[in-house]
Amino acid sequence: MSRKRNHCYMETGASSESQGAFVDSAGPFSRDEEDFSELEPDEQLVCSVTEITEHLGRNITVVLESALSEIRKLVGVRIRVLKMELREKSDEIELLKAKLESAEKDGRVSNFSSLDFRKSEHQKYGAEPKKAKTGTPVVKKENINAICDYLMKDKNQRGAAEVESDHSNQAFGSERDVRTEAQPHGSLSLWPDSGPADTDAETDIFSMLPSASKRMYDYEWMTGVELNSAEFKGDSETKCEDVPPMDEEDENEDSEEGRGSLRSVSDHFPLDTQGSPGEDRSSPAEDSMDRMEPGQQFTSHTFICPFCGTLCPDSSFLEEHIKLMHHGESLLQSTSAGSSSQAEGDSGEAGPASRGAREKKVEGGYECGDCGRHFNYLGNLRQHQRIHTGEKPFVCPECGERFRHTARLKSHRLSHSGAQSPFPCPQCGKGFPVLSGLKRHQRVHTGESPYACPQCGRRFKELGNLYTHMRIHSGATPYTCYQCGRSFRHLGTYKSHRCMPATQMPSEHSPPWAQEDKVQTGRLQGYV
């Protein structure tokens, strides 16, 4: 019995030992599985971060490429515009260089003739001829005002007797002899490099020219005129106005370069002279006009290009400038010259007297006599007055449609030819005849509203819309029906209102501009 018990005890002990060994061997395996399960989420997180990084990198690359392409388009459009402007300026510079060379040649010839004349004069009276340099005197740019002052004095003295001019020439000759003996090696330059000389040296450069030199008088348009004054800036650049237009069309038209209707040198090119009647211009030349004697005359004129406002010394220079720079525009103007002159004759308002009555000179600019609108420059006022007179001098040769401004005609003719507008929108491709129109249109894409109402704070993209809105606060009703006497706040309401057929309108109550835009700005109500 004891043997059996010992045998069973040994079997049970062995089995328990084997079970313990199995449990010990299974323990490390379960711990490895737990560690592996803990590592799997970390690896998945690393993979997801890598995928997100790659996706973001691809998106950023696509966005950068699209942005670069848009920037290239914008820069390309701007470069093309600048190249066109540079090409036009280069052509004009070449023309001016040719004119300058011819002027220098004429100046040298006149210098030689004056020197020969004085040499013969000295030999006649037994005087020893002096030596003079044959080069053209050099005048610094910063001293051009002194030359203008001298030319003004010479112009005021031009009407004196010939005997007095002969005596003055002899006096200048004797003074030159004295100065050349005192300074035998002096330069004929008006101002040396060391600084400006005394006032006696100013007469040296001009005493070399004869008193009747044609080239000097051809360029008298420079005398006593401040070229940086507001008057001449208005003819070349009119980008903004103190008083805004009432509708988008007028705002686009006023933003063009100043091309007011000007006096003509020929039948086809209207020009404006500095001393034209009906104008109230103020310039430094008026002071010299007050000091002139009754027997003298002020004969200098300023010839202005009607298309770009360039100042020209004479009519021939202006005609060449128009042929070279504005050949197409001059043909269009000549096409519409007969019809516009007939319209002016029928209306009876194109005369100097009526124009002077409608052009009021006020402090700081000009005022329209019809609606009271204020302008900085006379050219812009005359463009605006086409609204009141109904004048549309520019005619399309293809369809016969008429326009108030040449820029509108250019844009219209592009529709016939199928060509691209000079200023296309880079976002939507819409074309505009002037750069200011493109800038206003781009506010639609950018969402910019720069004009705010001072009373309610509402903002507008267009200045004309702001002034139309301000009529709500002021109660202004500038559009009046000439049959029933009703007044309207908006032009569209006025045009849609018809209390009597247009054929029954009495002529004495409907002026020619009543069917057009009877624009009366907020200035009449005290808001300008």
UniProtKB/Swiss-Prot annotation:
PROSITE patterns: ZINC_FINGER_C2H2_1, ZINC_FINGER_C2H2_2. Changing C428F: In st78; gross morphology is normal. Expression of myelin basic protein (mbp) in the central nervous system (CNS) is strongly reduced, whereas mbp expression in the peripheral nervous system is unaffected. It is found in: Nucleus. Residues 244-256 have a biased composition (Acidic residues). GO terms for biological process: central nervous system myelination; positive regulation of myelination; positive regulation of oligodendrocyte differentiation; regulation of transcription by RNA polymerase II. It holds the Pfam family zf-C2H2. GO terms for molecular function: DNA-binding transcription factor activity, RNA polymerase II-specific; RNA polymerase II transcription regulatory region sequence-specific DNA binding; zinc ion binding. Residues 333-345 have a biased composition (Low complexity). It comes from the Eukaryota. Residues 79-106 form a coiled coil. One of its GO terms (cellular component) is nucleus. Keywords: Coiled coil, Metal-binding, Neurogenesis, Nucleus, Repeat, Transcription, Transcription regulation, Zinc, Zinc-finger. A zinc finger (C2H2-type) spans 303-326, 366-388, 394-416, 423-445, 451-473, 479-501. Disruption phenotype: Gross morphology is normal. Expression of myelin basic protein (mbp) in the central nervous system at 5 dpf is strongly reduced. Expression of mpb in the peripheral nervous system is normal. Residues 232-242, 257-270, 278-293 have a biased composition (Basic and acidic residues). The keyword ATP-binding does not apply. Residues 1-28, 159-202, 232-293, 333-359, 502-528 are annotated as: Disordered. Probable transcription factor. Important for development and migration of oligodendrocyte precursor cells, and normal myelination of axons in the central nervous system (CNS). Functions autonomously in oligodendrocytes to promote CNS myelination. Seems to act in parallel with notch3 during oligodendrocyte development. Belongs to the krueppel C2H2-type zinc-finger protein family. This is Zinc finger protein 16-like. It comes from Danio rerio (Zebrafish). The gene is znf16l.
